[in-house]
Amino acid sequence: MKVLFLTANEFEDVELIYPYHRLKEEGHEVYIASFERGTITGKHGYSVKVDLTFDKVNPEEFDALVLPGGRAPERVRLNEKAVSIARKMFSEGKPVASICHGPQILISAGVLRGRKGTSYPGIKDDMINAGVEWVDAEVVVDGNWVSSRVPADLYAWMREFVKLLK
């Protein structure tokens, strides 16, 4: 499967690095999309290569979506092309994994009303206001959406997402 990450500078390093390598280990093709080509750097200094820009992404070419957290989602959610990619993939039932602040992109996409999920506790109110039944759990699976809270939840998050991709 082809898996797309939507992110930008100041991503939470382990929330991108771990799923990136875990999904490659499972045999998936993994692509990172951001505002510009080149490299982006996480909050703790880890840099990754950007494969394509948001405006070059065709959501039809991807099978699943990952939304890491950190500070990046605050900026990504302001990019209409990135939000439309997330909206389309989520609405079409493609597997979507979000962690920490990653759901901010889905909130902006307007796709979470009536869904059950989790996030970083600091955006709990935003999730509830978007219509999410927010649960304080290491991982929540609701149909095509797998959500988690913080880096300590990474293993459970990817375990459930990998199951969804099979």
Curated annotation (Swiss-Prot):
Catalytic residues of the enzyme: 100 (nucleophile), 101
CDD domains attached to this UniProt entry: GATase1_PfpI_like
Classification via NCBIfam families: deglyc_PfpI, PfpI
Localization of this protein: Cytoplasm
Class of this enzyme: hydrolase
EC number: 3.5.1.124, 3.4.22.-
Name of the protein: Deglycase PH1704
Organism taxonomic ancestry: Archaea, Methanobacteriati, Methanobacteriota, Thermococci, Thermococcales
Pfam families per UniProt: DJ-1_PfpI
Residue stretches in coiled coil: none
